[in-house]
């Protein structure tokens, strides 16, 4: 189940995008996740690293192409992430993982335009809001889920 957390922090996908992710939206051979009908009904492509790819390959094994990867609706996914955080003693929400993704990328040297594109933001100003959070406390929170 925690593959969904890993996917969120490694892709910056929105809660609804994670919930609606189909097996056919993952291009394993190209190391890409295709977000279909994201916010504003826009599609985007997000690269994925080898670690996430291997976790998703394992999770998707035996599933049909039109099957959801995680099997949650958006609202229940948000509640599940909160529940996992509560279990670990960390107040966390699905959207916090998106903030973590953006902040972590910037701290590791990505430029703001790259982060904007990965998050699927139309406006650079929206991306700048995401970067106002400090990653340290979010990273500590994620480690508690390990």
Across the structure, where does each feature detected by a protein language model lie?
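Basic, Lys/Arg- and aromatic-enriched nucleic-acid-binding interface segment
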Residues: 1-15
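C-terminal catalytic core of tyrosine-transesterase DNA break-rejoin enzymes
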Residues: 6, 10, 83, 98-122, ...
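DNA/chromatin major-groove-contacting recognition/catalytic segments
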Residues: 47-50, 133-146
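Short, leucine-enriched amphipathic alpha-helices that occur as contiguous helical runs
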Residues: 1-2, 74, 78, 98-99
């Amino acid at each position: 189940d925690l593959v969904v957390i890993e996917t969120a922090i490694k892709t910056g996908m929105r809660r609804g995008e994670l919930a609606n992710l189909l097996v056919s939206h993952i291009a394993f051979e190209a190391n890409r996740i295709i977000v279909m009908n994201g916010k504003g009904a826009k599609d985007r492509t997000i690269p994925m690293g080898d670690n996430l790819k291997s976790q998703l390959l394992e999770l998707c094994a035996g599933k049909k192409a039109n099957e959801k990867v995680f099997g949650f609706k958006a609202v229940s996914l948000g509640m599940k992430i909160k529940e996992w955080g509560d279990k670990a003693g960390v107040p966390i929400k699905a959207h916090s993982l998106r903030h973590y993704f953006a902040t972590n990328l910037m701290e590791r040297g990505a430029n703001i335009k790259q982060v904007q594109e990965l998050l699927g933001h139309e406006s650079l100003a929206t991306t700048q809001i995401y970067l106002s959070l400090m990653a340290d406390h979010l990273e500590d929170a994620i480690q508690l889920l390990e």
